[in-house]
């Protein structure tokens, strides 16, 4: 009986070590999934930043376009602009 008790105890200990080894494996899986989640979150943040940059660049482009039109309007709004050059000659 003592041998069976020793065997049962050994089996129970082995089962315990299997559970202990299973826990770190689960921890590794969790840490890998956390790493993947962190990577996904970083990618989302980068994409959001890139979209904001694109919007700001497109907005800046519109501002430049508006300014260039304003310059054209000013130069075309001066009907006497050519006469000023003729007067200096």
Swiss-Prot record:
PTM summary:
Phosphorylation at Ser-56 favors interaction with CALM1.
Chain coiled-coil ranges: none
Q: Where is the composition biased (Low complexity)?
A: 9-25
Q: Where in or outside the cell is it found?
A: Cytoplasm
Which domain of life does the UniProt lineage start with? Answer: Eukaryota
The ranges of region (Disordered) come to 1-89
Q: Name one GO cellular component term.
A: cytoplasm
Which keywords fit this entry according to its UniProt record? Acetylation, Calmodulin-binding, Cytoplasm, Phosphoprotein
Q: Does the keyword Acetylation apply?
A: yes
List-wise, which residues carry Phosphoserine? 33, 56
Bias (Basic and acidic residues) occurs at 40-53
Cystine bridges: which residues? Answer: none
Tell me the residues on which N-acetylserine occurs: 2
What does this protein's UniProt record list under function?
May act as a competitive inhibitor of calmodulin-dependent enzymes such as calcineurin in neurons.
Name recorded for this polypeptide? cAMP-regulated phosphoprotein 21
The scientific name of the source species is Pongo abelii
Q: What is the lineage of its organism?
A: Eukaryota, Metazoa, Chordata, Craniata, Vertebrata
